[in-house]
Amino acid sequence: MIGQFNLTFELAWKALQEILRLHGAEGADTGSPREILQLGYKLGFVNDSAVWLLMLKKRNTSVHIYNEQEVDEMILLIRDSFIPAFVALEKTLREKLAEAESDWT
């Protein structure tokens, strides 16, 4: 589950970066997940910056989880906080992509 979280986080922030680029957001070309998440929050693409920055931190430290208690804590975070944030981002990105596509026609 933790490995899937890491993969999903990577895909999520990179998808956010692409949609920000489509909308012409200045600064979207950076390679930094932190900057992309902060820009996404500033522009209203991300609802809860604290959750996303916590995800970034947990993604970076999850490779160093060595005991069952830490695994259990991470699973609870994923279930209770991170999955809802991914779902909300998916909805927002679909809407923003549709907006960008309608501008092309």
Annotate each predicted stretch with a short phrase.
Residues 1-105:
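Solvent-exposed interaction patches of small proteins and small membrane subunits
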